[in-house]
A protein has these predicted regions:
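Conserved class I S-adenosyl-L-methionine
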Residues: 44-53
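Conserved Rossmann-fold cofactor-binding substructure of NAD(P)-dependent oxidoreductases
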Residues: 96-101
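Conserved SAM-binding motif I beta-strand of class I
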Residues: 70-74
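Conserved acidic residues
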Residues: 91
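Short loop/helix-cap segments at secondary-structure boundaries that form the rim of catalytic
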Residues: 78-85
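Conserved SAM-binding loop of SAM-dependent methyltransferases across substrates and taxa
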Residues: 54-66
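Conserved small/polar residues in nucleotide/adenosyl-binding loops
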Residues: 103-105
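Class I SAM-dependent methyltransferase Rossmann-like catalytic core
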Residues: 2-42
Length: 105
């Protein structure tokens, strides 16, 4: 089972495209599709990415908000640093983590 999953994972064109584009996850392309269709995030916006690990959506959000915007990512798991984002480890339901997140925004 694991061998078959690995082989399919290696052949996945979205995974390869994400890697070639510098995105941490193939899910980055899903946010790009949503953004193209609904324009949810705008230049200069502040974004709180809840459950941000591994960071693909955070990377896309940074691209969209630009230099005037802010992106904060929160996850229970440690996420490797992403230039342009403030990343936190913790549960966003914890009032302290939520307050710290909002301070950055």
């Amino acid at each position: 089972m694991a061998k078959r999953w690995y082989q399919e994972h290696q052949r996945d064109p979205w995974r390869r495209q994400a890697k070639n584009s510098g995105y941490r996850a193939r899910s980055a392309f899903k946010l790009k599709q949503i953004q193209d269709k609904y324009n949810l995030i705008r230049q200069g916006d502040s974004v709180l990415d809840i459950g941000c690990h591994p960071g693909g959506w955070t990377q896309v959000a940074i691209e969209v908000v630009g230099m005037d915007g802010k992106v904060v990512g929160v996850d229970l798991r440690t996420t490797e640093p992403i230039p342009g984002a403030a990343l936190m480890v913790g549960d966003v339901m914890d009032p302290l983590i939520l307050d710290l997140s909002l301070i950055h925004i």
